[in-house]
């Protein structure tokens, strides 16, 4: 466990690699039992993302959070402490959406199949996913949680939360060349200094206790609005993928397998 703590410390000290919840506050410990912290190893080095438990054996995150190996920490509040509630699970299989495009960041969604099932507890449990009959509307108030930096110069190792409102699609279409209202959500009032940013990527946008979006990208300076992947548009793919990859828990390997479906 000690090497992992050292790696987490390294990640949190990297300004460009660590994520930001801007304008938020510290969350009540373990009030977001679906939250996952992802420690990612890639040829470029170490990075961190958010994610969220959607079934005992699957975490949902952003497709751009892929690496050669991923460790998932569930049940955490302070990611630099060895909390009794924490469950550290390696990823067996990373399944990017087959139409993910890193050039325009479209279809930025990925399922992570865990090497073993998470144990449900008061600090670890899945979040609900959206139904087709209920759609987000501009003005809806939602919550984003994540670890990382809270400003350009100040970091944190405890889970942060911020409330953000859904915006009109046109606002993001005016700011981001490749914004697609069919598969993305525009979130965050530009008149407020509140946003999710960068390493918070992969974390959930939760509205009325349902995960509706995934932190995807925003402006370089973190000013809102930001773009979130619209989970509802990908529900057929999510359900099909989780059915296809039946749980097969194996001993840890040095690298994870990658699949598309």
Swiss-Prot record:
Primary role: Serine protease with trypsin- and chymotrypsin-like specificity. Also displays antibacterial activity against Gram-negative and Gram-positive bacteria independent of its protease activity. Prefers Phe and Tyr residues in the P1 position of substrates but also cleaves efficiently after Trp and Leu. Shows a preference for negatively charged amino acids in the P2' position and for aliphatic amino acids both upstream and downstream of the cleavage site. Required for recruitment and activation of platelets which is mediated by the F2RL3/PAR4 platelet receptor.
GO BP term (any one): protein processing
TM annotation in the entry: none
Protein name per UniProt: Cathepsin G
Organism encoding this protein: Mus musculus (Mouse)
Residue ranges the record assigns to the propeptide: 19-20
Membrane topology note: Peripheral membrane protein
Enzyme active site: 64, 108, 201
Disulfide topology: 49-65, 142-207, 172-186
Keywords: Antibiotic, Antimicrobial, Cell membrane, Chemotaxis, Cytoplasm, Disulfide bond, Glycoprotein, Hydrolase, Lysosome, Membrane, Nucleus, Protease, Secreted, Serine protease, Signal, Zymogen
Glycosylation sites: 71
Summary of the tissues where the protein is detected: In adult, detected only in bone marrow where expression is restricted to a small population of early myeloid cells.
A cellular component term, taken from the record's GO annotations: cytosol
Regulation: Inhibited by chymostatin, phenylmethanesulfonyl fluoride and diisopropyl fluorophosphate.
InterPro entries named among the record's database cross-references: Peptidase_S1_PA, Peptidase_S1_PA_chymotrypsin, Peptidase_S1A, Trypsin_dom, TRYPSIN_HIS, TRYPSIN_SER
Catalytic activity: Specificity similar to chymotrypsin C
């Amino acid at each position: 466990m000690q090497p992992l703590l050292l790696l987490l410390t390294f990640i949190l000290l990297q300004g460009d690699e660590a994520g930001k919840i801007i304008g938020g506050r510290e969350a009540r410990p373990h009030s977001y039992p679906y939250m996952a912290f992802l420690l990612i190893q890639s040829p470029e080095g170490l990075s961190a993302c958010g994610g969220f438990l959607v079934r005992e054996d699957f975490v949902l995150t952003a497709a751009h959070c892929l690496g050669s190996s991923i460790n998932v920490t569930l049940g955490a509040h302070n990611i630099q402490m060895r909390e009794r509630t924490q469950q550290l699970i390696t990823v067996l299989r990373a399944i990017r959406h087959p139409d993910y495009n890193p050039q325009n960041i479209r279809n930025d969604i990925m399922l992570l199949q865990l090497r073993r099932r998470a144990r449900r507890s008061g600090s670890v449990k899945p979040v609900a996913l959206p139904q087709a009959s209920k759609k987000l509307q501009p003005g809806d108030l939602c919550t984003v949680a994540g670890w990382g930096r809270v400003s350009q110069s100040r970091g944190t190792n405890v889970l942060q939360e911020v409330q953000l409102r859904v915006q009109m699609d046109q606002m993001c279409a005016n700011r981001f060349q490749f914004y697609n209202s069919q598969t993305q959500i525009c979130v965050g009032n530009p008149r407020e200094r509140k946003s999710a940013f960068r390493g918070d990527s992969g974390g959930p946008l939760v509205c009325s206790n349902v995960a509706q979006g995934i932190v995807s990208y925003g402006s370089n300076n973190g000013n809102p609005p930001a773009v979130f992947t619209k989970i509802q548009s990908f529900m057929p793919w999510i359900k099909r993928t989780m059915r296809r990859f039946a749980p097969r828990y194996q001993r840890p390997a040095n690298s994870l397998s990658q699949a598309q479906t």
